[in-house]
Amino acid sequence: MGIARTKTIKNKHSAKLANLRNNKSSSSQADGGNFVRAKKSGTGSNKPPLTSQAKGRPSIADLLKKKKKRVYTEKELGVPKLNMITPVGVEKPKGKKKGKVFVDDPESINTILAIVQAEKEGQIESKIMKARQMEEIREARRVEAEKKEAERQAKLEDTKNSLRKKRSRSNKTEDDGVSELAATGSKATKAKKKKVAFA
């Protein structure tokens, strides 16, 4: 046995591989190469090499392939539909035909419907009542405004008439005074006193 040649190692991991190769070559030299391995003849059956996997287990290649994931619909997942308002009584139970049975007991749905109808009718009635009240108030205000306007017009006419009467009276007195002065002339005489004698 001689001294083995050393090689420069560029990679630290390749040192282990080199040691293994050296060991194999030294062991084959130690055996002296006394035996020769028999080569397999090509005339044998062409069977594929057996894999280490059993028949029932999937192979690594099958595992590495990506499986298509199943996509579930919203109906299968039971996701509620958005942007829809459905009353509690009208909601369709799962697994039952649509339009057949909405609620377990029909009395409860009838009471719910009656309550809703009463509320709606009450709202409508209250709106009608409010409209009537507002109409009555408007009518009363209109009548009151007409009455006030009539009173104001009457007062205005009274004041106009009184002013006309005053004017006519003042004109008459002035005319009487002027006529008396014209009749008596320029002489200013005392007015004669009326004497009344009793028998």
UniProtKB/Swiss-Prot annotation:
InterPro entries recorded: Loc1 (IPR037650)
Keywords: Coiled coil, mRNA transport, Nucleus, Ribosome biogenesis, Transport
Cellular compartments annotated: Nucleus, Nucleolus
Subunit details: Component of the 66S pre-ribosomal particle.
UniProt-recorded Gene Ontology molecular function terms: mRNA binding
The keyword Kinase belongs to this UniProt entry's keyword annotation: no
The species this protein was found in: Pyricularia oryzae (strain 70-15 / ATCC MYA-4617 / FGSC 8958)
Recorded coiled-coil stretches: 129-175
Domain of life: Eukaryota
Residue ranges, compositional bias (Basic residues): 189-199
Chain's role: Required for efficient assembly and nuclear export of the 60S ribosomal subunit.
Ranges annotated as biased composition (Basic and acidic residues): 141-161
Gene Ontology cellular component list: nucleolus; preribosome, large subunit precursor
Keyword Nucleus: yes
Main location: nucleus
Bias type Polar residues, positions: 20-31, 42-54
Region described as Disordered: spans on this chain: 1-59, 141-199
Name of this chain's protein: 60S ribosomal subunit assembly/export protein LOC1
Family named by the database record: Belongs to the LOC1 family.
Gene Ontology biological process: intracellular mRNA localization; mRNA transport; ribosomal large subunit biogenesis
